[in-house]
Amino acid sequence: MMRGIYIVANDRVMENAIALLNSIRCYNKTVPIFLIPFNEDYHQVAETLGRLHDVKVFPDLDFLEQLTQQIGEIFDRDFLKLPNKMRKLAVWFGPLDEFLYIDTDIVVFEDIVANLDYLSEVGFFCCDYHFSGQKLRNIFSPFVVEQNIFTEKELEDVFN
């Protein structure tokens, strides 16, 4: 079973990507890490992260392009202005069996890969920062409350 990390980046966010990779490698020198290119402007960040931190480019760029094109056709531009933002969904079709997806505006302060051990208890987990003062606005549509998809008690756990 192959475990590892996916990131999405391009040359524009290279400094953030370097900071993220520096923090990951501080605690774990060997975990496989794959870069999913945000767009065609990724060669410099790929070369730099490959040289400094042994990051590999996502192995199926044709699939990535097809996925992006399909997402762009499915979702109206009023809903999703940049289909490339959904390239992160390619993680489900990549070479890793168990994985973390980490945004490049993050730094870690522990061996983040140890969190993959939770997959022995659950099939999926998500950790994301959302300002609690915004309540559900940035996470769920009010529809989930109105239709009782989640109870108020269940939603309280979102801001643990």
Q: What residues fall within each predicted segment?
A:
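Conserved donor-nucleotide/metal-binding helix-loop-beta segment in metal-dependent transferases, i.e.
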Residues: 108-144
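N-proximal low-complexity "stem/linker" segments adjacent to membrane-targeting elements
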Residues: 1-21
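Short internal beta-strands
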Residues: 33-40, 126-128
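Short aromatic/hydrophobic "clamp" motif used to bind/position activated sugar donors
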Residues: 99
